[in-house]
From Swiss-Prot:
Its main location: plastid. The gene is rps6. Belongs to the bacterial ribosomal protein bS6 family. Keywords: Cyanelle, Plastid, Ribonucleoprotein, Ribosomal protein, RNA-binding, rRNA-binding. InterPro entries: Ribosomal_bS6 (IPR000529), Ribosomal_bS6_CS (IPR020815), Ribosomal_bS6_sf (IPR035980), Ribosomal_S6_plastid/chlpt (IPR020814), Transl_elong_EF1B/ribsomal_bS6 (IPR014717). Transmembrane segments: none annotated. GO terms for molecular function: small ribosomal subunit rRNA binding; structural constituent of ribosome. This is Small ribosomal subunit protein bS6c. It comes from Cyanophora paradoxa. It holds the Pfam family Ribosomal_S6. GO terms for cellular component: cyanelle; ribonucleoprotein complex; ribosome. The keyword Ribosomal protein applies.
């Protein structure tokens, strides 16, 4: 008897991840962080990637002894496993202060 396993096609959902980088980073370091996240998304099958720099803002409370942060938003379409991969990378990054992902 032959066993056939059926895989569900992964549905692409639109997500928006907002993250805050340290304000002490240089332009080159900021660009490298953005490119690393973008490459990670592309390598894992994300589509329609839009990255927005919303600028440097004062934080409501101290995060890792920082008063300010540089805010970015990434909007992308991908499978739900992609969110876990991106958030794991952000959690391990010393330059990312906070991140939050929403379904759009």
């Amino acid at each position: 008897m032959q066993v056939i396993t059926l895989q569900k096609p992964s549905k692409k959902i639109t997500y928006r991840t907002t993250y805050i980088l340290k304000p002490s980073l240089t332009e080159e370091e900021i660009t490298k962080e953005i490119e690393d996240y973008q490459k990670l998304l592309i390598d894992n099958g994300a589509e329609d990637i839009i990255i927005e720099n919303t600028g440097k803002c004062r934080l409501a409370y101290l995060i890792n002894k920082q008063n300010d942060g540089i805010y970015f938003q990434i909007t992308y379409r991908g499978a739900n496993t992609l969110v876990n991969i991106l958030q794991r990378r952000m959690r391990l990054s010393i330059n990312t202060l906070r991140y939050q992902t929403f379904k759009v």
